[in-house]
Amino acid sequence: MANPKIQNPKGPRGPMSGMMPGDKPKNFKATMRTLGAYLRPFRLRLIIATVAAILSVVFSVVAPMILGRATDVIADSVITSSPLDFNTLGYILVLLLVLYGVSTIFSGIMGFLMAGVSQKISYQLRKELSEKIDRLPLKYFDTRTQGELLSRVTNDVDTINSTLNQSLAQILTSAVTIVGILSLMVYINPFMTLVALVTLPLSFLVVKQVVKRSQGHFKDNQRFLGEVNGHIEEMFSGHVIVKAFNGEPQSKETFESWNQQLAKAGEKSQFISGTMMPLTSLIGNIGFVLICVVGGYLAFNGRVSIGNIQAFVQYIRTFNQPISQLANVVNVLQSTAAAAERVFELLAEREEVPDQDLLPFPCLEDIRGEITFDHVEFGYPQNQSSQEKLLIKDFTFLAKPGQRIAIVGPTGAGKTTIVKLLLRFYELNGGKILLDGVDIKRYSRQDLRSAFGMVLQDNWLFSGTVSDNIRYGCMNASEEQIEKAAIAAHIDHYIKTQPKGYDMEIQEGASNLSQGQKQLLTMARAFLASSPVLILDEATSSVDTRTEVQIQKAMADLMENRTSFIIAHRLSTIRDADVILVMKDGDIVEQGSHQELLDQKGFYKILYESQYE
């Protein structure tokens, strides 16, 4: 399905933003038009669903009139003391069964069609959101929380799905029911209809006041629920730290505070909203009493039959339900429009700069690995709206093929940023980066990144087997190649001691592996990729000293004839680097070999000696 034109509404943000009842959109009409564009491909289904809804309501609304006829037959028999006409009653009962049966069938058809439409649109939205997230630049994620993105993909899409599946059907059936019942009430007796409608404005007023008073408490309820969920998630993910520092009492106190506020807000919201039904029922009963009095008087004077009074009473009983449903749907549509705004806002976000004027990417074997940073400038966004503050300023450096370049410096100096720019995770503010003399912008991101093997500080593993995780470095690798990579990374022995070996399942978050084992598996990926350029970001930060020595030897073999960028805080690990770049505040303040830098007695020597004090 072609994407409809996306507006760019600025809805409220936050992980719980998609869950607040009564949340109002900034531009209701524009959002609903955009949402309507997703409904257009299903016009035929929606038309059939509408016809089915109308027929379902028509058959169910006519039924009380037919039942009233049965009441008249019985009443006539009693009044005239004549035998009861069982044939007529039997015919009426069969007709009622047919009417209700056909009504149920059409209602089922409508429900089936609406469920299909809502699920297909939800699928389409989730697909577009997933693809959109893949195309967003990393700087977008620097200024948003994970909870916010998850809320848009899950909560907001679920809200839209629920509305399309239930609320649209309610609008159809409620509107047709109101028109049908009102028409038949007028047909039975216009004066009785006028009496019945006297209580209608009062019902609307009650519903409006209850919704108005409960809405604030519902918002508080969802806000406190978000705080409780966030606290629980925080305590669960950091339970080891909580226990280690005896933080349970403080954690319990914080939870108790949020939980009490949640309970109070929930109690108020549920109590106030719970008064709607009894109050509307009271008003309905008052109207019912008035109808009984007026109907009895009219029946006594022969102006209306007993059967019609019985049908009219049924209509009155049914009349308030679709009105309440429509009142509720108005609020639901407001929340849905707000949720849709947040979804469409994400879909309208600026994407990565598209690849243009691309050159054919050379074979990996032909890449020499010469990397040139030519007056590079770059800054991270400080928040969602502010200008970027430069971190890397006029960075210039030439990495020769096969060189081992170590990048060191204090936290925040820009070490990891350099390799992120090399992989085009971010676009430069100024200058350019060349691979073998060609601007990396002339290659597609996918091709460019295939030239780099990496072991990052965040040793990310996904749920699946050990073999699958290592194969991520080269998706078409054989089992033999995977095993060789594991041997090179010194993780093969551990894998084979496990019951399932390379088929061992890695749990969510890799909780069944130690930090060192996670690091070794990510290293095995890099061995398997065998790329011409290597990036090692704190590659041995999570392993013990003995394992580190083994890995350093293996890394030396791996880095042979490959340009390698090594980022390390432990300066003892980069003594053998060909060139060490010392960074501070985004600039290279010193460069040279380990011994040369020590002899300069500058910033590098201060860093080096501080690790041995």
Predicted regions and their residues:
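Juxtamembrane loop-to-helix connectors within ABC transporter transmembrane domains
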Residues: 21-23, 30-31, 39, 71, ...
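Hydrophobic alpha-helical segments in the permease module
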Residues: 95-103, 107, 200-207, 273-287, ...
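Cytosolic ends of transmembrane helices, especially the final helix of ABC transmembrane type-1 domains
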Residues: 115, 224, 247, 271, ...
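Transmembrane helix-loop-helix hairpins at lipid-water interfaces of multipass membrane proteins
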Residues: 3, 46-106, 187-191, 302-306
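Helix-loop junctions and hydrophobic alpha-helical segments within the transmembrane domains
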Residues: 71, 129, 133, 242, ...
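An intracellular "coupling" helix at the cytosolic face of ABC transporter transmembrane type-1 domains
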Residues: 138-139, 157-164, 168, 172, ...
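ABC-type nucleotide-binding domain
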Residues: 362-613
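Transmembrane helices of ABC transporter permease
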Residues: 45-58, 99, 166-220, 291-304, ...
